Amino acid sequence: YEVMPSLVGSEMCIRDRIVPGNHEYYNYSDVMERGMQWKWMFRENVGFYQNQVIRIDDTDFVLSTLWSRINPNDEYFVWKGMNDFRQIKFDGKLLQVEEFNRMHETCIDFIRKSVEESTAGHIVVVTHHLPTLEVIDPQHKNSVLNSAFASEYGDWIANSRIDIWIYGHSHTNIDTEIGSTKVICNQMGYIFA
């Protein structure tokens, strides 16, 4: 990844909206400290948004982490293989698969409701996790860890009013189209302080 942290909040970026990903909660941050719907402005023009809709002109931006749904058959492998379960807290305890899946349900319910209720001419959904397995890197297509990265909503997206779905988290930039929705990868990468 090429990371240019000096751009975030600079004069080159008028307004930055950041969707928190799993790494924003590492080092034992508690996911529930802020709840499942919040915004946090850490500069006048830069902020994190979780399960929020922002209207700009005639476009609704639906912003959500969209935690993925862990496949029951892969729970053990995901729990053992992903640092999230050793680095993130949920209500004071280390995150477990059950809470991960509960957060997923909260996020997808928010996204679906926001898209359904939108009166904007255009809808852009921005998530951290992937909305479809179609954008998993081909070299990882059969990985037991895929459900920690993506949930399958291709059929719903194809029949939705969503114009663009922007995602990150995949470690590989893959763009595609599902129905009339452009699915675009825009991940920032890691910032090491």
Residue spans for each PLM region:
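Active-site metal-binding loops of divalent metal-dependent hydrolases
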Residues: 10, 22-24, 52-53, 65-67, ...
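Conserved beta-sheet core of the metallophosphoesterase superfamily
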Residues: 17-19, 132-193
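Beta-strand-turn-beta hairpins that frame and shape the catalytic cleft
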Residues: 53-63, 122, 177-182
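Short catalytic/ligand-binding loop motif for oxyanion handling, primarily in non-cytosolic enzymes
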Residues: 26-28, 56-61, 69-72, 132-135, ...
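Single conserved hydrophobic/aromatic residue that forms the stacking wall/gate
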Residues: 1-9, 14
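Active-site-proximal loop/helix segment associated with metal-binding centers of metalloenzymes
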Residues: 62-124, 129-140
